[in-house]
Amino acid sequence: MGLLNEFAIQLYSVKDETAEDFIGTLEKLGKNGFGYTGVEFAGFGGVSAEEMKKALADNGLKAVGSHAMTDKLLENLDEEIAYHKAIEAEYIICPWADMETKADVLALAQKLTPIAEKITAAGLKFGYHNHAHEFVKDEGEYLLDILFDKLPAGTVMELDIFWSEYADVDSLAYMEKNKNRLEILHVKQIGENKKNVELNKGFIDFEEVIKKAQAMGVKHFILEQEEYEESSMASAENAIKYIRGL
């Protein structure tokens, strides 16, 4: 597949399709369809773990992990862990949290620390996915850096490069600085007026980014697409064709 032997998709990218037919969408994305090798979930659509595991296997898809909001983890952590273990997923990622100040971050870290510890004790990995607001500075430090400093060692960074670029961060330098915790990269393109565009239409040189990320030891590369030229599935197909060509 060019630079990448494996390429996953965050299913939020095709949420309109999974809402209609979750298993059918996996069939379109997997080995007999577009050729993705993995998925990252954003909810499981009411599908049982047993049925999901079979659908993943049937379509040559690995469950990288999922996005789960803090409230969901606080309320249903045991169930989330059990589901992830049943489908052989590796990561549970917090995809968003409000924060404006260091005090907000410290309060968040207090909430997330016992969650992270329980996930790790179960043999899974806990991580955090950024947007742009975590790159606000308080006392000279990015809020994201303060958060990771306060979370347990081993907490994984899932860097969304669209949002780091949106925040005018030097993404490659930031990745290098955090390479010991950076295991997942959201492959997501930024274009004119800071819009999310197709992978081949924006400013990020993904050939350079992927090569450098591989050298840093990044384990998983995951498409996330929130805006589409034509449709969510057309974007998903275009993205993997682009990645194959690198």
Where does each model-flagged region fall?
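Active-site acidic/histidine proton-transfer and metal-coordination neighborhood
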Residues: 27, 35-38, 55, 70-156, ...
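Conserved beta-strand positions in the central sheet of alpha/beta enzyme cores
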Residues: 8, 38-40, 65-67, 93, ...
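Short glycine-centered, acidic/aromatic-flanked micro-motifs in structured strand/loop junctions
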Residues: 11, 41-43, 68, 96, ...
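Active-site mouth loops of central-metabolism enzymes
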Residues: 8-20, 66-73, 98-104
